[in-house]
Amino acid sequence: MKKIAVLTSGGDAPGMNAAVRAVVRKAMYYDIEVYGVYQGYQGLINNNIKKMERGTVGDKIQRGGTFLQSARCPEFKDPEVRKQAIANLNNLGIEGLVVIGGDGSYRGAQRLNEEGIKTIGIPGTIDNDINGTDFTIGFDTALNTIVEAIDKIRDTASSHERTFIVEVMGRDAGDLALWSGLAGGAETVLCPEHRKDVKVIADKIQQGIERGKKHSIIVVAEGVMTGEECGQELKKYINVDTRISVLGHMQRGGSPSGMDRVLASRLGGYAVELLMNDETGLAVGIQNNSLSKTKFEDIFTSVHHLDEKMYELSNELSI
């Protein structure tokens, strides 16, 4: 393989730049030309493809976001649109493509693979909701961002004896809510996988008040309900002073953590190795701290599961 390309797609995640850097540097080490596709699949369609040099990825490993930029591209589902994207790659002699993103990005990569472009997927999303890997690029950084916010919110919650509801990302997966709730000592965590009755939460807070507890933190994943909705429901059962904190897109930003930089570097390098070995239609991952590879179709046919033992522990420690 003489030429490959790399793109980032879907929601940005801290560490994507580190993954791009690893792909570029690893490929160049083996004298493979690398092209960067700007603005994700939209860039493939628009032929926004540029040759990368070693210096192109210099001073990028510590930067958040993605310098290749990203864009949603629903029209990529259209076979005629993909034909144009494939033609653009073929005209440049590009044989392989590395796609960094989430589930939707993987589906685009799978279609390209079926249509003749050798593809490898790298999991890049803060939600940690992709099968075939224990952790996704960006999850650790987002987790640290949320925990830092919870720590600061707890200071003011304690000062004013309030109940704070912290809304975090996670439409279908509760990993961010669970992990940040456990690390931040939250009194209650609401995950899409475990939809608690708000009355149960209210009873728990009331029991804490009766024991002398002056403040509480509730972490709710956006896929369960909004923080505002949670607060309104809570007031139906208990008279507490509540405040809502929606962390929003700040969870996606910031310099990637050391763990995310290392993970991204390992996965980026491994993706190039697979293409060099003519292996394709695969997503790379990390399982039990070892590099792994999974067929795209196997990722789509399995369901992401919350760590139930950790969920039980969170409940046990939040009495």
Curated annotation (Swiss-Prot):
The active site is at 127 (proton acceptor). Keywords: Allosteric enzyme, ATP-binding, Cytoplasm, Glycolysis, Kinase, Magnesium, Metal-binding, Nucleotide-binding, Transferase. It is found in: Cytoplasm. Allosterically activated by ADP and other diphosphonucleosides, and allosterically inhibited by phosphoenolpyruvate. Pathway: Carbohydrate degradation; glycolysis; D-glyceraldehyde 3-phosphate and glycerone phosphate from D-glucose: step 3/4. Its EC number is 2.7.1.11. One of its GO terms (cellular component) is 6-phosphofructokinase complex. It catalyses: beta-D-fructose 6-phosphate + ATP = beta-D-fructose 1,6-bisphosphate + ADP + H(+). ADP binds at residues 21-25, 154, 185-187, 211, 213-215. Its cofactor is Mg(2+). Coiled coil: none annotated. Belongs to the phosphofructokinase type A (PFKA) family. ATP-dependent PFK group I subfamily. Prokaryotic clade 'B1' sub-subfamily. Catalyzes the phosphorylation of D-fructose 6-phosphate to fructose 1,6-bisphosphate by ATP, the first committing step of glycolysis. HAMAP family: Phosphofructokinase_I_B1 (MF_00339). This is ATP-dependent 6-phosphofructokinase. It comes from Macrococcus caseolyticus (strain JCSC5402) (Macrococcoides caseolyticum). The lineage of its organism: Bacteria, Bacillati, Bacillota, Bacilli, Bacillales.
